[in-house]
Curated annotation (Swiss-Prot):
It comes from the Bacteria. One of its GO terms (biological process) is rRNA 5'-end processing. GO terms for molecular function: nuclease activity. It is found in: Cytoplasm. This is Putative pre-16S rRNA nuclease. The lineage of its organism: Bacteria, Pseudomonadati, Pseudomonadota, Gammaproteobacteria, Enterobacterales. It comes from Proteus mirabilis (strain HI4320). NCBIfam families: RNAse_H_YqgF (TIGR00250). GO terms for cellular component: cytosol. Gene3D superfamilies: YqgF/RNase H-like domain. Its EC number is 3.1.-.-. The gene is yqgF. It holds the Pfam family RuvX. InterPro entries: RNaseH-like_sf, YqgF, YqgF/RNaseH-like_dom, YqgF/RNaseH-like_dom_sf.
Length: 139
């Protein structure tokens, strides 16, 4: 098991959640949620957190249909991952994110009821779930 810092993204066409984690502990925490327009974020905001955290690896959630097939947003998430690599030179891993948003909503509701279910919290928590799920698959 290595001690890499890993950043996770929950890609969406209107909002993108971010989380940061350590491979050695297999845990992550939410960082932020960024507004996007048709899947395109404000790259200066993304650059800021990448410079601040300097991740060794970035995991991008891959939105698939429940049967494992791809959908339009799957292609957009792959483009986002490719742009992250191209702009910042970071190593990228794609990870199946099916049901991460459902799990994030359940987790947040359990902790704080309906008030905790704002979109930013859900997206950042989804990024945590994607990242921790990726850690589990590695070991």
């Amino acid at each position: 098991m290595s001690n890499r810092t890993v950043m996770g993204f929950d890609f969406g066409t209107k909002s993108i959640g971010a989380a940061i984690g350590q491979e050695v502990t297999g845990t992550a925490r939410p960082l932020a949620s960024f507004k996007a327009k048709d899947g395109i974020p404000d790259w200066s905001q993304i650059e800021k957190i990448i410079k601040e955290w300097q991740p060794d690896l970035v995991v991008v959630g891959l939105p698939l249909n429940m049967d494992g097939t791809e959908q339009l947003v799957t292609t957009q998430a792959k483009k986002f991952a490719n742009r992250l690599h191209g702009r910042f030179g970071v190593q990228i891993a794609l990870h199946d994110e099916r049901l991460s948003t459902v799990e994030a909503r359940a987790h947040l509701f359990e902790q704080g009821g309906y008030r905790s279910l704002d979109k930013g919290s859900v997206d950042a928590t989804s990024a945590v779930i994607i990242l921790e799920s990726w850690f589990e698959r590695q070991y």
